[in-house]
């Protein structure tokens, strides 16, 4: 029978519940169990697709085209699995489904209520995640903090599951904060006690408490937390701040987190074999050189908006025994006069995705600077589009060339709306989303790094390169190295006489793994390392 683990959080948000859940998933997977994982977000949006990155951070896209929470990126990278639309559930999705059922008459004229209709729908999403993947264990992270009004139906649903399927099949892990009070020079357990008290008042007794802390906590403090929260002392797991995220699974294993889970759930499985993971952590802790990549974006004040991009850069760096630092460059501040200064000290330039006109001209300037000065360059989504616009303007001489998204009246719409998008009115969930094939041209840099004729990558866009300009651009040395199999859509562009100038319409960052870097990132970082070594 499938087992269900729920990870909740207390005291404050952004405690790292997602990292704890992902780390546990990795440990259980390495014990030979089939693990899947999901995130429940209590906000009323149907998904984060239309939310500002300043509000939510990155939107992570799955193979099947779901626009999801950035924690799913952590899950995929840590556990090395591909998730799907059942892996992210929001209040908006649940209410939308229940209201559709009510309109169809599925409830036979009954009064639709939070209990049982909303809670039943929530439980169904948990069960479905297990059925769709045939999982031995489903880990569900509940977003937000215990005590939030929005979280109450979620907590009630997971409370009910203990009665529905039995105590040994359900487990609750609660993440809390033990803050350090600098003036007193002490760690304080009271917030944890109150958080657990709040959770217990809702009918949930945590089996394990994971304590986030700036510094090690004493055994006496663990005993105190165990006493007040009514759990075994060994079930108080310390999670100290770490410089290297990938060390956390090993720290949790050292304290027996996965063993506690297996004992409670009567899971007969081998010890977690973590030698490959230990090699990764050892490598990350002992990198021999450092390079700096300039990231030119519009959301640089919030690094979480580019979290998968940054992680992918780091993964690629590991392959070259290199620590990759990121220099954040606000695209709105970039001009022809200051680009050299803003990118000084960098060994490569990356222009990631984005929407809207803010900062686009700065990205075009940065792209031109990389092209003209033989600086390794990687463009993603909008980054590919601005690379195309820049080339059209400054090499082909098409003054005023632009994207129809930004300048609908441009004489040279190098980037235009996808034909199938012309009648679309809604913004949410209507982009070209998910995994699509890309056919690579032999003899190109893209083919060289992928070593494959057809590759599959994840997309999130509404605009595309305008084929009316394709021949004209090709004649001037612009290389279309990847297209859709029918040749209709441009997927990758590059330049021949350049150390590395490659850009993709898709989002390669969504498929990178710490032990298996994504090929375009690996090629980009390889060129950047070479450039750094030649200085």
Swiss-Prot record:
<feature type="binding site">
    <location>
        <begin position="148"/>
        <end position="150"/>
    </location>
    <ligand>
        <name>CTP</name>
    </ligand>
</feature>
<keyword id="KW-0460">Magnesium</keyword>
<keyword id="KW-0436">Ligase</keyword>
<protein>
    <recommendedName>
        <fullName>CTP synthase</fullName>
        <ecNumber>6.3.4.2</ecNumber>
    </recommendedName>
</protein>
<dbReference type="GO" id="GO:0003883">
    <property type="term" value="F:CTP synthase activity"/>
</dbReference>
<dbReference type="GO" id="GO:0004359">
    <property type="term" value="F:glutaminase activity"/>
</dbReference>
<comment type="similarity">
    <text>Belongs to the CTP synthase family.</text>
</comment>
<feature type="binding site">
    <location>
        <position position="54"/>
    </location>
    <ligand>
        <name>L-glutamine</name>
    </ligand>
</feature>
<dbReference type="Pfam" id="PF06418">
    <property type="entry name" value="CTP_synth_N"/>
</dbReference>
<feature type="binding site">
    <location>
        <position position="354"/>
    </location>
    <ligand>
        <name>L-glutamine</name>
    </ligand>
</feature>
<keyword id="KW-0547">Nucleotide-binding</keyword>
<comment type="subunit">
    <text>Homotetramer. Interacts with BrxC.</text>
</comment>
<feature type="binding site">
    <location>
        <begin position="382"/>
        <end position="385"/>
    </location>
    <ligand>
        <name>L-glutamine</name>
    </ligand>
</feature>
<dbReference type="GO" id="GO:0044210">
    <property type="term" value="P:'de novo' CTP biosynthetic process"/>
</dbReference>
<feature type="binding site">
    <location>
        <position position="71"/>
    </location>
    <ligand>
        <name>Mg(2+)</name>
    </ligand>
</feature>
<dbReference type="GO" id="GO:0046872">
    <property type="term" value="F:metal ion binding"/>
</dbReference>
<comment type="function">
    <text>Catalyzes the ATP-dependent amination of UTP to CTP with either L-glutamine or ammonia as the source of nitrogen. Regulates intracellular CTP levels through interactions with the four ribonucleotide triphosphates.</text>
</comment>
<feature type="binding site">
    <location>
        <position position="71"/>
    </location>
    <ligand>
        <name>ATP</name>
    </ligand>
</feature>
<feature type="binding site">
    <location>
        <position position="462"/>
    </location>
    <ligand>
        <name>L-glutamine</name>
    </ligand>
</feature>
<dbReference type="InterPro" id="IPR017456">
    <property type="entry name" value="CTP_synthase_N"/>
</dbReference>
<feature type="domain" description="Glutamine amidotransferase type-1">
    <location>
        <begin position="292"/>
        <end position="534"/>
    </location>
</feature>
<feature type="binding site">
    <location>
        <position position="224"/>
    </location>
    <ligand>
        <name>CTP</name>
    </ligand>
</feature>
<feature type="binding site">
    <location>
        <position position="13"/>
    </location>
    <ligand>
        <name>UTP</name>
    </ligand>
</feature>
<feature type="binding site">
    <location>
        <begin position="14"/>
        <end position="19"/>
    </location>
    <ligand>
        <name>ATP</name>
    </ligand>
</feature>
<dbReference type="GO" id="GO:0019856">
    <property type="term" value="P:pyrimidine nucleobase biosynthetic process"/>
</dbReference>
<feature type="binding site">
    <location>
        <position position="141"/>
    </location>
    <ligand>
        <name>Mg(2+)</name>
    </ligand>
</feature>
<feature type="binding site">
    <location>
        <begin position="188"/>
        <end position="193"/>
    </location>
    <ligand>
        <name>UTP</name>
    </ligand>
</feature>
<feature type="active site">
    <location>
        <position position="509"/>
    </location>
</feature>
<dbReference type="GO" id="GO:0006241">
    <property type="term" value="P:CTP biosynthetic process"/>
</dbReference>
<keyword id="KW-0479">Metal-binding</keyword>
<feature type="binding site">
    <location>
        <position position="13"/>
    </location>
    <ligand>
        <name>CTP</name>
    </ligand>
</feature>
<dbReference type="InterPro" id="IPR004468">
    <property type="entry name" value="CTP_synthase"/>
</dbReference>
<feature type="region of interest" description="Amidoligase domain">
    <location>
        <begin position="1"/>
        <end position="267"/>
    </location>
</feature>
<dbReference type="InterPro" id="IPR017926">
    <property type="entry name" value="GATASE"/>
</dbReference>
<dbReference type="InterPro" id="IPR027417">
    <property type="entry name" value="P-loop_NTPase"/>
</dbReference>
<dbReference type="GO" id="GO:0042802">
    <property type="term" value="F:identical protein binding"/>
</dbReference>
<feature type="binding site">
    <location>
        <position position="405"/>
    </location>
    <ligand>
        <name>L-glutamine</name>
    </ligand>
</feature>
<feature type="binding site">
    <location>
        <position position="224"/>
    </location>
    <ligand>
        <name>UTP</name>
    </ligand>
</feature>
<feature type="active site">
    <location>
        <position position="507"/>
    </location>
</feature>
<dbReference type="GO" id="GO:0005829">
    <property type="term" value="C:cytosol"/>
</dbReference>
<comment type="pathway">
    <text>Pyrimidine metabolism; CTP biosynthesis via de novo pathway; CTP from UDP: step 2/2.</text>
</comment>
<feature type="binding site">
    <location>
        <begin position="188"/>
        <end position="193"/>
    </location>
    <ligand>
        <name>CTP</name>
    </ligand>
</feature>
